[in-house]
Each structure stands twice: as C-alpha cells, then as structure tokens.
UniProtKB/Swiss-Prot annotation:
This is Wound-responsive protein GWIN3. Residues 1-24 form the signal peptide. The keyword Signal applies. PROSITE patterns: SOYBEAN_KUNITZ. It comes from Populus sp. (Poplar). InterPro entries: Kunitz_inhibitor_STI-like_sf (IPR011065), Prot_inh_Kunz-lg (IPR002160). Belongs to the protease inhibitor I3 (leguminous Kunitz-type inhibitor) family. Keywords: Signal. GO terms for molecular function: endopeptidase inhibitor activity. Induction: By wounding.
Length: 200
C-alpha cells in the first residue's frame, strides 16, 4: 500500500514539474540558419559566403595548401561546408550551435594540411586571422543573426573549443588587408548554395 501511494505521489510531482516548467521539458531547437533563398542551410552541403557589397569569401591559395581566408571582389568565391559538433536528426545547421567550417576544395597533399578553418597567427597580416589546417572538434565557430539585419548572419569563432580556454565567442570580420580575422570590424554574411551543386 505504501509503495502504491509513493508511486502515485511521484507521478503527481512529475506531472506538476512538466506543466510548471514546459520549456525545460519540451525544449525547442534553435532557429535554423537560412540561405539566400530562405531555405534551411544543410550540414555537408556547399555554400558560397558573401556580403551585401558582393565581396565573397575565398582562399589565398587553391588547392588548399596552408591557405588563409579572405574577402575578395570581382572573382568567384570558394564554397564551404558546415558540420555541426552535435549531429541533428534533420541535418540542419542551427543558430548559435557549434560547427566546423571547411572549404569544399581539394588540398595540396602536404602532411597536416586540411581545408578546415581555424585561427592562426600570420605576420604578413599582422595578427591572428582565419586560416586553414583546422582539426575536427577543436576549431569551432557558430552562426547567429546579424544585429542590424535579420536576413544576414554573423560568424563567430569560439575559442572555448581550445584546450584550457573558457572564453566567449568573438565575431569574425575583415581586417584592413581583407583577411578574415577575429575581433575586428563586424561583417554581415549570407549563404548561397553553390551553383555547381544546384545544377547537378
């Protein structure tokens, strides 16, 4: 009899908690990142990253071979792919979640060369910039809505993915030499499906 009463009381407490704290029990996924056409950005698909002024994200060297990430004008950009750290059931990239970013391009075959983005020091660019050669799950970024325009997004680097660093994510923009770099002027980005993929 006591066991029956205990089980009944436990059920009532659980039901009360579920109705009193619905957000904790029925947590919703963050909003999906949308591409240029208003469609959900998909993990593993190829996208070109551009700005409202039509500058596009590109690499200093292609094929990727210790290449740096830049904003360029007047030429076709180099597509990237996004991969979530925690795989979602629907394969959608969502706002504010940790991701890796990689150029969708071949590499030169040197040891340790990868198309994945990371932050590295560059004496030519006079500081830390976004470059290639990243390692999965150690070099993380996130995408959030750009403050001034809901149709554009902000890309941020999250140094808390680095060992022994509990630091906030920092926005990525373009420095005076057009290198993508952390903690410089804000940059508003949008994501266009790679036309070469769309046409296949």
């Amino acid at each position: 009899m006591k066991i029956t009463k205990f089980l009944g009381l436990s059920f009532l407490l659980f039901a009360f908690a579920a109705t009193s704290f619905p957000d904790g029990v029925h947590a919703e996924d963050p909003a999906a990142v949308l591409d240029f056409y208003g469609r959900e950005v998909q993990a593993g698909a190829s996208y070109l990253i551009d700005q409202e002024d039509f500058r596009v994200v590109n690499a200093t060297i292609n094929p990727i071979c210790n290449s740096d990430v830049i904003l360029s004008t007047g030429i076709e950009g180099l597509p990237v792919t996004f991969s979530p750290v925690i795989n979602s059931t629907d394969g959608v990239i969502r706002e504010g979640t940790l991701i890796t970013v990689s150029f969708d391009a071949s590499t030169c075959g040197m040891a340790g060369v990868t198309p994945m983005w990371k932050i590295g020091f560059n004496s030519t660019a006079k500081g830390y910039i976004v470059t290639t050669g990243g390692v999965d799950r150690l070099n993380l970024f996130k995408i959030t809505k750009f403050e001034s325009d809901s149709s554009f997004y902000q890309l941020s680097y999250c140094p808390n993915s680095e060992p022994f660093c509990e630091c906030p994510c920092v926005p990525v923009g373009a420095n005076s030499d057009k290198y993508l770099a952390p903690n410089v002027s804000y940059a508003d980005f949008r994501f266009k499906p790679d036309a070469r993929i769309e046409s296949t």
